[in-house]
Structures are given as structure tokens and as C-alpha cells.
Amino acid sequence: MPSVKVRENEPFEFALRRFKRICEKAGILAETRKREFYEKPTQERKRKAAAAVKRQMRRTSRDVTKRKRLY
């Protein structure tokens, strides 16, 4: 778990902001949301496959738009 030591004469809000930033970088909130409810293995595979298709479509659409410009 990330920890933050409050420096001398440092306001609590600044330390809290640093802690939030560290947690965000570590991905703790995303992990918590993901584990909030049980996800069946088949549902997880479906979700990951759909994300891969979406990524691939986005990647190919970017390539197509880059090649279209002939000016």
C-alpha cells in the first residue's frame, strides 16, 4: 500500500494530494472497482476480446486517416 510521510510545515491537503496521485499511479482504485463484483471467466474473456477488437479498430482507423491525406 502506498504511504506518504507528511513533511514538516506541510499542509495536510498537499500530503493528501500526493497520496491520491501515488494511488492513481499504482492503479489501486481501478483494481478495487474491477474486484468489486465477481466476474465469471467467460465474461472476462469476452470483455478482453471486445477491448482488443476496439483497440484494433481504433488503430486501423488512425492508419487509414493518416494515409488519406494527399495534399
Swiss-Prot record:
Keywords of this entry: Ribonucleoprotein, Ribosomal protein
GO BP term, example: translation
Molecular function terms from GO: structural constituent of ribosome
Family annotation (Pfam families): Ribosomal_S21
Gene Ontology cellular component terms for the protein in this record: ribonucleoprotein complex; ribosome
Keyword GTP-binding: no
Highest taxon, organism lineage: Bacteria
Chain segments carrying region Disordered: 39-71
Residue spans of biased composition, Basic residues class: 45-71
Database matches in PROSITE patterns: RIBOSOMAL_S21
Keyword Ion transport on entry: no
Matches recorded under PANTHER family: MITOCHONDRIAL 28S RIBOSOMAL PROTEIN S21, SMALL RIBOSOMAL SUBUNIT PROTEIN BS21
UniProt family annotation: Belongs to the bacterial ribosomal protein bS21 family.
Protein name per the record: Small ribosomal subunit protein bS21
Organism from which the protein derives: Xylella fastidiosa (strain M12)
Gene name per UniProt: rpsU
